[in-house]
């Protein structure tokens, strides 16, 4: 059928701010949906308050609203834009929840807006109405675990007594299993039910008989309005049911199912999507008894999901773009597969390789957090690897995680006893994969490990072969290794770095020997059809099996962009934004773009973005292999975060030409002695600081500087390993804990304002469009700070110094491209804290709110252009912004028991949000609005320690009740509880802060953040405005200044 001509405009709901369980996958799918709608001539209206996304670029939508994802805000947008249709399935659970709320509030009916794709009943049944959903499944003959929906602890207990333990608790309308878990006894059950009811936006939980230990199988299914259904991909979780699929190792296609089991579950998936009437994509999860053919349906996600992005990248099938086309009337048989350009979308993908996904968990940041995995997702991101055999796919996935180990050995586990390792498996610890390998090294039988983990023996035997590879490598040396053995080790995924470590030589030695023997990878194509048809895509993975399948290059000059790898705390979706914009700029300049990355969630790994895409680990070996295979002469590292920067030294030593930066330049900025020397040469003030190489030096030099001091390592991102130390005793305790790495930098801690700026430079001139001022004082990581664009309280003199110092640094270094500089303003001086010779996490928000495309300008400068050629001189100064932009952090620490929500120098946030308004107060209101709306009847704040009279008076004036004399354990359960205030940051009160967070209360440990919140309480309305409206006001203001 042709597209629906009754639609002229479509409102797309984004997924909002990134968090654990909600990362870049929704940016990828949402971007594809916007492009698909624009291709069909529809006017696209987008609401999404995540500034780091590609989808919120004005080229992808006709009107972009950075507004809260609430009924009130979206209704205002609908009234203003009058869309004909609304699509929520690309906004994750956030989008579905909001669509349901708009329907229930009568907003869609009032304005005549049609819900596209997933019908409202399909949204309600799997999540909001388990009774009706279960009835439908029984009608279809589809087995579901015995379950009951409850709205109170009492109802839950009554059902638990009927079915017995273990029991799974699933809160309704949440994402990533938030608030849920498996209870083995009544004590655990009561805690999880109470938490789950609190997390659910409709105060409901599904209480379900546990099928933990069964195989977990997923199907990505697609359906059109003619009821044509296909399965795009089926995936098997290595971990059995009981660990959230987002935290599990996943392989595609499934490896342990018989054909009968595969077809049985496929038929079930098709039957379910048809019965629900879903138009578009759907993720369906099953639990399969490993000892019989009994299965249960455990979850239906009637939307694009994290698994959808994985399935899309695993198969090459455009799983996001096609559902958008289906939603407006097309059928699968009418849509051509853009990969082959000859087959149709109704043709099911086929794989002639294996894909392995590993989760990226945050415990390197939070080693003291509860590392046990369950039904609530904790991962911040993931990596994907492709190869022709299971062992190499596993090894490539581990290499992509960027851990400190070159192979599969975790040193921290090698000192544990067998019983301790077994306990890690029983507890479902995040290190269980490495614990299994350690037990196998010690000769523990596969059968015993299977008994403890319920992981299929097929996978355990594959792990056993990985251990055998280690022994085989250790039995040789670089001089004695036979070609056949060497080739076998490479075929099975042993990295050059691992072999170098094993043989006591350098990685370059191994590489040279390997090339001398002609052992080099070939590159195979991801084509959706297992080479059955000709493919038009340049989407590749490396393997040591078979012939090279790469197409002939275009003849254009090539540039390689190194991506940022998996999303993690400190390095998120913002870096993908910069990478993609660099690709766009290069293509406009006539270059052939080559992207290397390993993150299946991102836009940068969409095969339609760069001219050639390589899905590979971001290791020196893999990057050099691609450079040599493609004969690349230009490499960009500035947009790949610390991942790419850490490769600079090795690439330079290998003779690779890097654009805009050298290792010496980076070292000059990271080595504190050299950095301070640079600043002194330029007459730029810096914070007093010293370097310590051991514990004795650290204690002496900290005393020399005087407390408080800030400790930080070099070459890190996200403030990893940073501490503020207030006393000699606190330092002694840190040294005793053994958590410090040397050499370590010791800076005097200045209690002042913090600011930062992103600049682009050609080595002579700079463009610095806006100064960002942090709300909190220095000492809170920039990624965890609320921040104003433009700066709100800096004087003209302070701004002039910030710009002047940036210009001096850029010119002295001869730096080209983009950099981020951080400052502290204290005692009447402007100090330079640090310079990052790369794109920062603030590039997207600066680019979008000023209209200055920093990443694209920087790319052109890297190619040799000057600012004079690109940016008009009048546009090089600070932007005139007649509006207030507030960047605010998003934390997922409530999903990580044991993590204190107190902010400090080490970054903890997993994402960011944006609010734009005419005044600071309204911008603050928009930032806190979803919380204030949820806690509309709450007015009590619990104070730990003391607060000053000024704050007390202000809170009283805002009609907040201050509580300090009620037992905390009683108060925190009240419906009137709003926030906990602990400005003294009492060390002994961490449990109260964590408990408050688990109850979804605000926790304030910084006076400035609390003041911002109080400002927000003065506002009671929302004014919605698209970004182009704000930029038009900016243009008018700048013209008025010129006039």
Curated annotation (Swiss-Prot):
The UniProt annotation places ATP 1 binding at: 170, 176-177, 209, 211, 216, 242-244, 285, 299
Q: Name one Pfam family in it.
A: CPSase_L_D3
- Residues recorded as binding ATP 2, renumbered to this chain, are 712, 748, 750, 754, 779-782, 822, 834
Residue ranges annotated for the MGS-like domain, each copy included: 930-1037
Name listed for the protein in its UniProt record: Carbamoyl phosphate synthase arginine-specific large chain
Q: Which UniProt keywords apply?
A: Amino-acid biosynthesis, Arginine biosynthesis, ATP-binding, Ligase, Magnesium, Manganese, Metal-binding, Nucleotide-binding, Pyrimidine biosynthesis, Repeat
User: Which gene is the coding source of this polypeptide chain?
Assistant: carB
> Pathway it acts in?
Amino-acid biosynthesis; L-arginine biosynthesis; carbamoyl phosphate from bicarbonate: step 1/1
Q: What is its EC number?
A: 6.3.4.16, 6.3.5.5
An example Gene Ontology molecular-function term: ATP binding
Detail which positions bind Mn(2+) 3: 822, 834
Positions contributing to Mg(2+) 2 binding: 299, 301
> Region labeled Carboxyphosphate synthetic domain — which residues?
1-402
Question: Organism, per UniProt?
Answer: Geobacillus stearothermophilus (Bacillus stearothermophilus)
**Which annotated residues bind Mg(2+) 3?**
822, 834
Q: Which SUPFAM superfamilies match?
A: Carbamoyl phosphate synthetase, large subunit connection domain, Glutathione synthetase ATP-binding domain-like, PreATP-grasp domain
